[in-house]
Each structure stands twice: as structure tokens, then as C-alpha cells.
């Protein structure tokens, strides 16, 4: 299984790119949004995180801009009724932050707007996403680094992340305070957020 492919971007369109590495051209399926971002790097070296889907008659690589996005894709396709193409369509429409917000607000209508997802599938997916929100949040934080100084930095960053998801400042402060009490003042924001979300 590949973690990522690093090489020269030799071809690009709205659904896939070709990366040449050591004389081999890898065709990688990706979202239209990511494709647009890559156009500025034609004939340059790029690094794309990949997930392999191997079937009896085909071997498909799906590409992502970050490890976090890749892990979110893997989470999505673990849900019943969500295949790789649908998972990619979801990430094309909703960046990680927005997907977290959709899950918290149980916005079935937003999920149902994704091509290939009907109302019943959207309702079921929403239940799954809501349960996995503590897993999604650290992914949204893009592999957070250790706070620069004290635990106060983690506390403030956590409040900001919760407010981005639609919580009020007062609610976010309460949730983070309870999370710190449960863990410790030295805990990272990635450790605190899943606990904080359970306090909502």
C-alpha cells in the first residue's frame, strides 16, 4: 500500500492527474477542487497522498492534498453505502472544517446535495458522521503540532476550533474547561477536542 507518491506532474484534468516517478506514470483520481489547486504546478515536483483500491479487474489510486484529507476519505468509505467515488465527491464539495460542521449540525440536506447520495443514504451517513465527530475533529486540525508554550495555547486553539463549528464562545469555553479537567492542562488540542465534543 502506498502512503504518498512524489514526482513530476505531467498531465492533469478535472478527474485525474499523472505523476511520473522513476520512469513510471501513476494515474491518480482526485477531486475537481484538488485538480484546480494543482494546475499551477504543471511539470513541477508534487507530493500527493494516496489511497489504493484494489479489485479483481482494476487497481485505482485516489489522491489527496494532505494526510488528514486521506484519513477522512478512508473514514467515509468505511460507512455502508459510501464507495470511493462518492467519498471523493463528498470531499470535493466539503473541506474538512465544513464537513465537521455539517456533522455537528446534522445537516442532512447538505449531504444529500452530493451527487450519488439520496435522502436515505444521507440520513444514515449523518448518523455515522455524528458518531465519528470526535475522530473527524483531529483530522480537521491537520496533524496539529505541539503548542508553542503552555496549555493555555491548546485551550485557546480548541475554543477557536469549536467556535468554527458553530458553538458559542460561552459553550466552547465550558466544553474546553471540562475537557482540561478530565485530561490535564498539558494535553494537546488534538487530545482535548474529542473530549470537549462529548461535553456539548
Swiss-Prot record:
SMART domains: HhH1. It is found in: Cytoplasm. One of its GO terms (biological process) is DNA repair. GO terms for cellular component: cytoplasm; Holliday junction helicase complex; Holliday junction resolvase complex. InterPro entries: DNA_helicase_Holl-junc_RuvA_I, Hlx-hairpin-Hlx_DNA-bd_motif, NA-bd_OB-fold, RuvA, RuvA_2-like, RuvA_C. Residues 1-65 are annotated as: Domain I. Residues 150-200 are annotated as: Domain III. Keywords: Cytoplasm, DNA damage, DNA recombination, DNA repair, DNA-binding. The keyword DNA-binding applies. It comes from the Bacteria. Residues 145-149 are annotated as: Flexible linker. GO terms for molecular function: ATP binding; four-way junction DNA binding; four-way junction helicase activity. Residues 66-144 are annotated as: Domain II. Homotetramer. Forms an RuvA(8)-RuvB(12)-Holliday junction (HJ) complex. HJ DNA is sandwiched between 2 RuvA tetramers; dsDNA enters through RuvA and exits via RuvB. An RuvB hexamer assembles on each DNA strand where it exits the tetramer. Each RuvB hexamer is contacted by two RuvA subunits (via domain III) on 2 adjacent RuvB subunits; this complex drives branch migration. In the full resolvosome a probable DNA-RuvA(4)-RuvB(12)-RuvC(2) complex forms which resolves the HJ. Belongs to the RuvA family. The RuvA-RuvB-RuvC complex processes Holliday junction (HJ) DNA during genetic recombination and DNA repair, while the RuvA-RuvB complex plays an important role in the rescue of blocked DNA replication forks via replication fork reversal (RFR). RuvA specifically binds to HJ cruciform DNA, conferring on it an open structure. The RuvB hexamer acts as an ATP-dependent pump, pulling dsDNA into and through the RuvAB complex. HJ branch migration allows RuvC to scan DNA until it finds its consensus sequence, where it cleaves and resolves the cruciform DNA. Has three domains with a flexible linker between the domains II and III and assumes an 'L' shape. Domain III is highly mobile and contacts RuvB. This is Holliday junction branch migration complex subunit RuvA.
Amino acid at each position: 500500500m502506498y502512503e504518498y507518491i512524489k514526482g513530476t506532474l505531467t498531465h492533469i484534468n478535472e478527474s485525474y492527474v499523472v505523476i511520473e516517478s522513476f520512469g513510471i506514470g501513476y494515474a491518480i483520481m482526485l477531486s475537481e477542487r484538488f485538480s484546480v489547486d494543482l494546475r499551477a504546478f504543471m511539470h513541477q515536483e508534487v507530493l500527493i497522498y494516496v489511497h489504493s483500491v484494489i479489485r479483481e479487474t482494476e487497481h485505482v489510486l485516489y489522491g489527496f492534498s494532505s494526510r488528514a484529507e486521506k484519513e477522512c476519505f478512508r473514514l467515509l468509505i468505511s460507512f455502508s453505502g459510501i464507495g470511493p467515488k462518492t467519498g471523493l465527491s463528498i470531499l470535493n464539495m466539503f473541506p474538512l472544517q465544513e464537513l465537521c460542521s455539517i456533522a455537528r449540525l446534522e445537516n442532512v440536506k447538505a449531504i444529500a446535495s452530493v451527487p450519488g447520495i439520496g435522502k436515505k443514504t444521507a440520513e444514515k451517513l449523518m448518523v455515522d458522521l455524528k458518531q465519528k465527530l470526535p475522530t473527524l475533529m483531529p483530522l480537521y486540525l491537520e496533524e496539529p503540532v505541539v503548542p508553542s508554550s503552555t496549555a493555555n495555547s491548546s485551550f485557546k486553539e480548541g475554543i477557536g476550533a469549536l467556535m468554527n463549528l458553530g458553538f458559542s464562545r460561552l459553550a466552547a469555553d465550558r466544553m474546553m474547561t471540562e475537557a482540561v479537567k478530565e485530561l490535564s492542562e498539558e494535553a494537546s488540542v488534538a487530545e482535548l477536542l474529542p473530549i470537549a465534543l462529548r461535553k456539548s
